[in-house]
């Protein structure tokens, strides 16, 4: 008895004329993501069917749950198109269930009709189990698909994927990766909307190899071990810019000016290396630099592209839950040096004014040239 997984697309069917291109991209991504296994992936228009070795099942399920574009999938058992064979396979459900119903789909019409199939299979199951039929609110739904004259499929449980769009259909963007909990989740959510995500981090002399390795581990986790695409990791030495920022006359604006500098540098890199937007992990009101006034003052420096903030309305509990689901949480909470926390004043401004931020930047004669030099000297790691 062979094992299959039927993969459903969800949102891709809303794409009209572009639907074929989106499905083609997802087909390619699934093949790449599973390249370490022996499998056969078939495009059956309304779904993909994956034939696989049973010993790889747990790992394959874990990967499929993380591939953007997959709405849900079923673990299917294959049976001959014979009603006795189908009934025996359908009887292989977990015996913990007390009620059930049967759903039937017939691609191959030259067989019993739906009512006859349901009656025969239900009779067999009721005879061999202590279970009742409940067509309105069953604990278990047994799905049967009569595929052709030779084979049929039976499945029991629907496994949810992450949904969204296939990676790569919406271009590339640049994520400002700090190593905390939020920015990896924000990166994953933009990846889920079809973006290939490249990563940018800022370091100073205090940042160690341990921190850089932590960031690389986060990127590897988000991108499914680099199977679907190879992200670029941009590392900017921020030391000299940070030393210049220390000379401002109002230290309460230190984080505001530092983040404005981050975004100026990020925008330059995104333009130079052909990315279409920036990503950050801001959550409205979470810290001083994420009040609406701070966000407005900081964002003003990005006049050539959008800054996406997918976590803007999420609270910390929600963000942590997603981080755990995608496997970044345990990596994020390990110790690391963070440029922002090391540079933060005791009492940062929570409602900065743009006019004051601009005036403070005008005090720093070397700021622009140091930012330009940081861009020119960026280190790029390609996995």
Swiss-Prot record:
Main location: cytoplasm
Signal sequence interval, chain numbering: none
InterPro entries for this protein: Rossmann-like_a/b/a_fold (IPR014729), ThiI_AANH (IPR020536), ThiI_fer (IPR054173), ThiI_N (IPR049961), THUMP_dom (IPR004114), THUMP_ThiI (IPR049962), tRNA_STrfase (IPR003720), tRNA_sulfurtransferase_ThiI (IPR050102)
Compartment(s): Cytoplasm
Listed transmembrane segments: none
A cellular component term, taken from the record's GO annotations: cytosol
EC supergroup of this enzyme: transferase
GO MF term list: ATP binding; CCA tRNA nucleotidyltransferase activity; tRNA binding; tRNA-uracil-4 sulfurtransferase activity
CDD domains named among the record's database cross-references: PPase_ThiI, THUMP_ThiI
A Pfam family of this chain: ThiI_fer
Top-level taxon of the source organism: Bacteria
Pathway: Cofactor biosynthesis; thiamine diphosphate biosynthesis
Coiled coil (UniProt feature): none
EC number assigned by the record: 2.8.1.4
Annotated catalysed reactions: [ThiI sulfur-carrier protein]-S-sulfanyl-L-cysteine + a uridine in tRNA + 2 reduced [2Fe-2S]-[ferredoxin] + ATP + H(+) = [ThiI sulfur-carrier protein]-L-cysteine + a 4-thiouridine in tRNA + 2 oxidized [2Fe-2S]-[ferredoxin] + AMP + diphosphate; [ThiS sulfur-carrier protein]-C-terminal Gly-Gly-AMP + S-sulfanyl-L-cysteinyl-[cysteine desulfurase] + AH2 = [ThiS sulfur-carrier protein]-C-terminal-Gly-aminoethanethioate + L-cysteinyl-[cysteine desulfurase] + A + AMP + 2 H(+)
List of residues binding ATP: 176-177, 201-202, 259, 281, 290
NCBIfam families registered for this protein in UniProt: tRNA uracil 4-sulfurtransferase ThiI (TIGR00342)
Purpose: Catalyzes the ATP-dependent transfer of a sulfur to tRNA to produce 4-thiouridine in position 8 of tRNAs, which functions as a near-UV photosensor. Also catalyzes the transfer of sulfur to the sulfur carrier protein ThiS, forming ThiS-thiocarboxylate. This is a step in the synthesis of thiazole, in the thiamine biosynthesis pathway. The sulfur is donated as persulfide by IscS.
Protein name listed in UniProt: Probable tRNA sulfurtransferase
């Amino acid at each position: 008895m062979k094992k299959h997984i039927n993969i459903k697309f969800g949102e891709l069917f809303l794409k009209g004329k572009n639907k074929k291109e989106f499905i083609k991209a997802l087909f390619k991504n699934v093949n790449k993501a599973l390249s370490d296994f022996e499998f056969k992936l078939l495009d059956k228009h309304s779904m993909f069917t994956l034939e696989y070795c049973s010993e790889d099942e747990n790992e394959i399920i874990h990967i499929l749950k993380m591939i953007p574009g997959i709405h849900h999938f079923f673990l299917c058992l294959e049976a001959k198109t014979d009603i006795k064979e189908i009934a025996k396979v359908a009887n292989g459900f977990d015996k913990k269930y007390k009620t059930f119903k049967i759903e039937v789909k017939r691609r191959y019409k030259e067989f019993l009709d739906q009512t006859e199939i349901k009656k025969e299979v239900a009779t067999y199951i009721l005879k061999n189990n202590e279970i009742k039929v409940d067509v309105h609110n069953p604990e278990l739904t047994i799905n049967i698909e009569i595929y052709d004259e030779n084979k049929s499929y039976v499945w029991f449980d629907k496994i949810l994927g992450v949904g969204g769009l296939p990676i790569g259909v919406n271009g590339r963007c640049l994520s400002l990766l700090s190593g905390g909990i939020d920015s990896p989740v924000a990166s994953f959510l933009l990846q889920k909307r079809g973006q290939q995500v490249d990563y940018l981090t800022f370091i100073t002399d205090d940042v160690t190899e341990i921190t850089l390795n932590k960031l690389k581990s986060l990127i590897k986790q988000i991108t499914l071990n680099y199977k679907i695409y190879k992200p670029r990791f941009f590392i900017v030495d921020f030391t000299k810019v940070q030393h210049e920022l220390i000379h401002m006359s109002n230290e309460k604006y230190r984080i505001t000016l530092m983040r404005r500098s981050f975004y100026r540098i990020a925008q330059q890199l995104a333009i130079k290396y052909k990315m279409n937007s920036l990503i950050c992990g801001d959550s409205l009101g979470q810290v001083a630099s994420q009040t609406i006034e701070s966000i407005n003052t900081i964002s003003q420096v990005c006049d050539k592209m959008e800054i996406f903030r997918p976590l803007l309305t999420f609270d910390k509990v929600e963000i942590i839950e997603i981080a755990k689901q995608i496997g970044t949480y345990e990596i994020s909470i390990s110790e690391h040096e963070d440029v922002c926390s090391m540079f933060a004043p005791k009492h940062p401004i929570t409602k900065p004014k743009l006019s004051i931020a601009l005036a403070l930047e005008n005090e720093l004669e070397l700021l622009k040239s140091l930012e330009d030099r940081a861009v020119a000297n960026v280190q790029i790691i390609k996995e």
